[in-house]
Amino acid sequence: MGASEHSSYFDPATGARVHQMTAHPSVSHSTYFLQRAFTPDNRLLIFTSYRAGSAQIFEAGFPEGPIRQISSGEAIHPFSPAILPNGLLLFVRGGSIWTIDRKTL
C-alpha cells in the first residue's frame, strides 16, 4: 500500500471542507459520474489512475487512508469501474467485463 496523498482546505466562499485525495503527478480521476465512487461502507474511494503506466483501478481510504492499486496488467477502460452494493468491483478491459472481489485481495 502507498501512503496517503490526502490534503484538505476550507472553501472560502462556502466554508465547506474540500478533500484532495491524490497528489501524484499522473492523471487520476473518478469513476463515471453516474456510478458510485465509494464502497458501500463509504470508507474507500475507488478511482482510476495512470500512475502505473496505464489506466488502472486504485482505492484510497477516506478521508486520509493509504492508496492501494487494485488492478494491474492490461489497461482498463478508464471510466468503467463500478461498485455493486455487495462491494464487488466491475470494470471493462479489452472489450470484456471483469470482476474483482476486493475482499480476496
What are these regions (language model features)?
Residues 1-19:
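Blade/loop signatures of beta-propeller domains
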Residues 19-28:
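Surface-exposed loop and turn segments in beta-propeller and other repeat-based domains
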Residues 4, 95, 100-105:
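Beta-rich carbohydrate-recognition and catalytic domains
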Residues 10, 60, 100-103:
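Hydrophobic/aromatic beta-strand positions that recur at structurally equivalent sites within the blades
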Residues 44-48, 90-92:
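Residue position within the beta-strands of beta-propeller blades
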Residues 33-42:
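N-terminal low-complexity or amphipathic/hydrophobic leaders
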Residues 6, 17-18, 65-69, 104-105:
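Predominantly a core beta-strand signature of beta-propeller blades
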Residues 27, 32-34, 54-97:
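Blade-loop segments of beta-propeller domains
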